[in-house]
Amino acid sequence: MNPEYDYLFKLLLIGDSGVGKSCLLLRFADDTYTESYISTIGVDFKIRTIELDGKTIKLQIWDTAGQERFRTITSSYYRGAHGIIVVYDVTDQESYANVKQWLQEIDRYASENVNKLLVGNKSDLTTKKVVDNTTAKEFADSLGIPFLETSAKNATNVEQAFMTMAAEIKKRMGPGAASGGERPNLKIDSTPVKPAGGGCC
């Protein structure tokens, strides 16, 4: 069997509603941007294949709803994620303050050694910026996780954010892991459905 990729990484985008998670995903996966804001309902995902260090890596990127009412649905997607990108809005202090809460969610639901990346989005809105780059960088450094400011609107650092995440995961997994597009990675999303029981509303 000759698979079309060497690695399959599942990434998760989390953060408050309205910080631009869907826009980041659209920019990275389709290189498009839209001003019209529609809240993600539950979970959406896109796939993009990248080349890194001579290897083909398939990124399965899950975009989660930020609203509290979807928290129980989205929490099941933490399981099996190789990397989680926590997004806040640089023009919204509350979304930055809530990063700690999102990191607690990761500790609660994700695997222990999952890779994390902190992203401050909407960096193009310089006049409205309230979260200082240095503050966020120091916070990320204290946790030992990478940090980037991005703009889905003008594409600043969007590519770099996802590539950084992929490189970190690849480094952690080492040369032998997840190669050959092994099937065990693909059954992750079929298991969390059962415990929920009688529907989600």
UniProtKB/Swiss-Prot annotation:
<keyword id="KW-0636">Prenylation</keyword>
<dbReference type="GO" id="GO:0007030">
    <property type="term" value="P:Golgi organization"/>
</dbReference>
<dbReference type="Pfam" id="PF00071">
    <property type="entry name" value="Ras"/>
</dbReference>
<feature type="binding site">
    <location>
        <position position="21"/>
    </location>
    <ligand>
        <name>GTP</name>
    </ligand>
</feature>
<dbReference type="GO" id="GO:0006886">
    <property type="term" value="P:intracellular protein transport"/>
</dbReference>
<feature type="lipid moiety-binding region" description="S-geranylgeranyl cysteine">
    <location>
        <position position="200"/>
    </location>
</feature>
<keyword id="KW-0325">Glycoprotein</keyword>
<dbReference type="GO" id="GO:0000045">
    <property type="term" value="P:autophagosome assembly"/>
</dbReference>
<dbReference type="InterPro" id="IPR005225">
    <property type="entry name" value="Small_GTP-bd"/>
</dbReference>
<feature type="binding site">
    <location>
        <position position="66"/>
    </location>
    <ligand>
        <name>GTP</name>
    </ligand>
</feature>
<feature type="binding site">
    <location>
        <position position="33"/>
    </location>
    <ligand>
        <name>GTP</name>
    </ligand>
</feature>
<feature type="modified residue" description="(Microbial infection) O-(2-cholinephosphoryl)serine">
    <location>
        <position position="76"/>
    </location>
</feature>
<keyword id="KW-0653">Protein transport</keyword>
<feature type="binding site">
    <location>
        <position position="22"/>
    </location>
    <ligand>
        <name>Mg(2+)</name>
    </ligand>
</feature>
<dbReference type="GO" id="GO:1903020">
    <property type="term" value="P:positive regulation of glycoprotein metabolic process"/>
</dbReference>
<keyword id="KW-0813">Transport</keyword>
<dbReference type="GO" id="GO:0070062">
    <property type="term" value="C:extracellular exosome"/>
</dbReference>
<feature type="binding site">
    <location>
        <position position="36"/>
    </location>
    <ligand>
        <name>GTP</name>
    </ligand>
</feature>
<feature type="binding site">
    <location>
        <position position="40"/>
    </location>
    <ligand>
        <name>GTP</name>
    </ligand>
</feature>
<dbReference type="GO" id="GO:0034045">
    <property type="term" value="C:phagophore assembly site membrane"/>
</dbReference>
<dbReference type="GO" id="GO:0005525">
    <property type="term" value="F:GTP binding"/>
</dbReference>
<keyword id="KW-0449">Lipoprotein</keyword>
<comment type="subunit">
    <text>Interacts with MICAL1 and MICAL2. Interacts (in GTP-bound form) with MICALCL, MICAL1 and MILCAL3. Interacts with GDI1; the interaction requires the GDP-bound state. Interacts with CHM/REP1; the interaction requires the GDP-bound form and is necessary for prenylation by GGTase II. Interacts with RabGAP TBC1D20. Interacts (in GDP-bound form) with lipid phosphatase MTMR6 (via GRAM domain); the interaction regulates MTMR6 recruitment to the endoplasmic reticulum-Golgi intermediate compartment. Interacts (in GDP-bound form) with lipid phosphatase MTMR7.</text>
</comment>
<feature type="modified residue" description="N-acetylmethionine">
    <location>
        <position position="1"/>
    </location>
</feature>
<feature type="binding site">
    <location>
        <position position="153"/>
    </location>
    <ligand>
        <name>GTP</name>
    </ligand>
</feature>
<keyword id="KW-0963">Cytoplasm</keyword>
<feature type="binding site">
    <location>
        <position position="35"/>
    </location>
    <ligand>
        <name>GTP</name>
    </ligand>
</feature>
<dbReference type="GO" id="GO:0048471">
    <property type="term" value="C:perinuclear region of cytoplasm"/>
</dbReference>
<dbReference type="GO" id="GO:0019068">
    <property type="term" value="P:virion assembly"/>
</dbReference>
<keyword id="KW-0378">Hydrolase</keyword>
<feature type="binding site">
    <location>
        <position position="18"/>
    </location>
    <ligand>
        <name>GTP</name>
    </ligand>
</feature>
<keyword id="KW-0547">Nucleotide-binding</keyword>
<feature type="binding site">
    <location>
        <position position="20"/>
    </location>
    <ligand>
        <name>GTP</name>
    </ligand>
</feature>
<dbReference type="InterPro" id="IPR001806">
    <property type="entry name" value="Small_GTPase"/>
</dbReference>
<feature type="short sequence motif" description="Switch 2">
    <location>
        <begin position="65"/>
        <end position="80"/>
    </location>
</feature>
<feature type="lipid moiety-binding region" description="S-geranylgeranyl cysteine">
    <location>
        <position position="201"/>
    </location>
</feature>
<feature type="binding site">
    <location>
        <position position="63"/>
    </location>
    <ligand>
        <name>Mg(2+)</name>
    </ligand>
</feature>
<feature type="binding site">
    <location>
        <position position="124"/>
    </location>
    <ligand>
        <name>GTP</name>
    </ligand>
</feature>
<dbReference type="GO" id="GO:0006888">
    <property type="term" value="P:endoplasmic reticulum to Golgi vesicle-mediated transport"/>
</dbReference>
<feature type="binding site">
    <location>
        <position position="34"/>
    </location>
    <ligand>
        <name>GTP</name>
    </ligand>
</feature>
<comment type="subunit">
    <text>(Microbial infection) Interacts with L.pneumophila AnkX. Interacts with L.pneumophila Lem3. Interacts with L.pneumophila SidD. Interacts with L.pneumophila DrrA.</text>
</comment>
<dbReference type="GO" id="GO:0005789">
    <property type="term" value="C:endoplasmic reticulum membrane"/>
</dbReference>
